[in-house]
Amino acid sequence: MYLELQKRLGSRLRGLLEEKYGLLVENIPLEIPPDLKFGELATPIAFELARKLRKAPRIIAQEIVSALNGLEGFAGFEVAGAGYINARLDRAAGVRLVVGGESLARASSGLHSLVEHTSINPNKAAHIGHLRNAILGDTFVRLLRAAGQKVDVQNYIDNTGVQVADVVVGFLHLEGLPAAEVRQLLEELKGKGERIDYYCWDLYARTSQWYEQGTAEENEARKELRYATLHEIEHGGNETAEVAEVISTAVLRRHLETMLRLDIEYDFLPRESEILHLRFWEAAFEQLKQTGVLYFETEGKNQGCWVMTRPATAGRPGAETTEGAFDEDAKVIVRSNGTVTYVGKDIAYHLWKFGLLGKDFGYKPFFTYPERETYPKHECWISAEHGDEPHPHFGGAQAIYNVIDSRQSDPQANVIQALRGMGYTAQADHYTHFGYEMVALTPRCAVEMGYDVSEEDLTRPYIEVSGRKGFGVKADDLIDKLIAATRAEVDARQTGGADAESGRQRIAEQIAIGALRYFMLKFTRNSVIAFDFKDALSFEGETGPYIQYAVVRARNIFRKGGTTPEAALAEFAGADAGAYLTGEAGEDIWALWLRAARRTLVLEQCIATSEPAYLAKHAFQLAQEFNNFYHKHHILTEEDPARKTFLLATAAVSLRELIEVLSWLGIESPEAM
C-alpha cells in the first residue's frame, strides 16, 4: 500500500510541476516522516525548486499544496516549516488497500538476473563464514524473485585451485593413498557414517602445517611439490587430477547437503576445470586484445606480461605520461611464463555469464532436490566437457550479482573495468559485487564450541577463525548445536505435547535455522559479525525466534477464537475502519497497519541497495509493533462486535505480512513454540 500511494503521489507531483512551472522532474524525493504527527509521507521538493523558480521554498510549497487536494487515497496536504510538504493519508482507504493486499505473487518483470553465491572451495567442510555468504545470497535470490525477476542461482566451484591441491598433497604424500585407495576410503567413511568433508578439514590443516615444519630446504621442496600438484590438476588426465576430481566432487555433495538444511538450493554448478578445458580463456583473450583492453608489456617490472590498461591510459601504455613510459601499476592478466591470473579467468567466466563469450559449458544433472514447501522438486546441474541433451539454458543474464567477501573488491573491480573497456557498458553497469565482511566468534561462543581460549582472547570482542589452522566452526556442527539448544527449550515448554516427538523436533529445527539466518541477515553487509549462541537464540530482542513467536502468538488468536485469518479479513471487507483509527489507541493501531503496508517498499529498497538487512529490520519492527498491539488490546474478549472484527482484521494482516517477509528471509513460521 505504501509503495502504491508513494508512486501515486510522485506521479501527481511530476505532472503538476510540468503543468504549473514547465519543469520536468524525473525523481521526486518522498520520505516517511519520523512521527505520525507530520503525516505519513513528506517531500522536500520545494527546497530543490527554489533556485530554479527564484522563490522561497515555503511559497512554492503553498502553491503546490493548493493544487494537490483531491488526490485519491490522501486526506490532505499541508506546508510545514520552511517549505516541507506533509501528506496525510485517508486512513480508512489505506486500511482497505492493505486488506486487499498488494499481490504476494508479483508479475514477471522480464528481467533475467544471475546470482552467484556460496562458492566454497571443495577441499573441506563448510564453515560459519561460508554460511553468511550462502544466507545473504539465498535471501537476495528470494527478494529478486519476489520482485518478479527470473533468477538463476549459481555456485562456482574452484575444483582446480591451490586449496584442493593442498588436500591432494595430503592424500598422496602425507597419507600415501593413490586414487583407487582414495575411492576405497570414501566407501569406508560412508559405511561408518563418517564424513569426507570433516576428514579433509583435518587433513587440510595438517598439510598446511607440514609445509612449514621441515628445514628450509625441505619446506622449499614441499612448496615446489604443492605447485607441481596444482599444475597436474589444472592439466588433467593424470592420477593427481583424478584424486582431485574424486575428492572435490565428494566434498561438493556434502556442501549441497549442508546448505539444504538451511533451505538453500542452486540451479547450476560451474566448475573451474571446465573453464580451463573448454578454453574459455582463449576466447576471452582474443576479445580483450582486439578491443585494446590488453597489451603486451616490453619494459619494466611487467616485461613479457599481458597487462590490462587502467581507465586513464586509454588502451595503450604511456598514454598518460611521457612518450616511451610504461605503466608500473597496470594489472597483469597473463604472466610472463604464460599462466593466466585469477582475474583473467574471471573475465572469461563473466563474459559467459552475460552471454558474450561465444562458448558454453556442457551440462550434466548432479543433485536432485526433493519437493518441499518453498521449492518444487528440481535438478541442480553441473558443468562438464561433454554434457547431456537436452539441458536447461544457463548464462546470458541481463544483471549479475556476485556474493563474494569484501577482500575481493579489487579483483571484482578489475572484471568490471575489463567489461567496460571492451565496450560492454550496459553489462558493466549491471554487475554488482555483493560484498560482505567476515564472521568471527564471541569468546563465549568459542568456549561453548570446545576451543581453548586464552585469557587475553577472553577480553576481546571477537575471535577470528582460520580453517588453515584448524580453528573454526564447521557449519553442520553449528547447526546441530543450535538445534540441540532449541530442542531443550522446546521440550521445557512441552510444545505439541509429551508424545509429539517429531513435532517438537521439527519446531526446534525451524527455530534454530530461523535464528541462524536472522542473525546473519540483521547486520549490514559491511559489518563484522561476532556470532554468539545466546544472542542468536534469544526469544527477546532483535532475533529470529522473537519474530517467529509473534507469528505463533497471532496464530493462537485465531485458533482460540475458532476462526481463521482469511475469515476475519472477509468479514471485515467493506467495513469503515476510520472510527477505530483516531485517538491515542487508534494512532498505535494505525502505526501497525502502516508498518504492515511497507512490505513492497522495503523490498524495492533492499534490491536497490543490495542490502537484505533492511528487510530483517522491517520484520523485527513489525513483530515488535504487533506484540505491543497484542498486549494493549484484549481481542477475543472485546464486547463490541464491530471493533472485535476490526481487531481480528488487524491481527490477520499482521500475521499475513509477518509470514510473507519471513519467507523472503528464508525463515519458516512455526505453528507452535
Language model features with spans:
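Non-catalytic interaction-recognition regions
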Residues: M1-V95, A107-M673
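Short, charged, solvent-exposed linker or helix-capping segments at domain edges/interfaces
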Residues: R96-E102
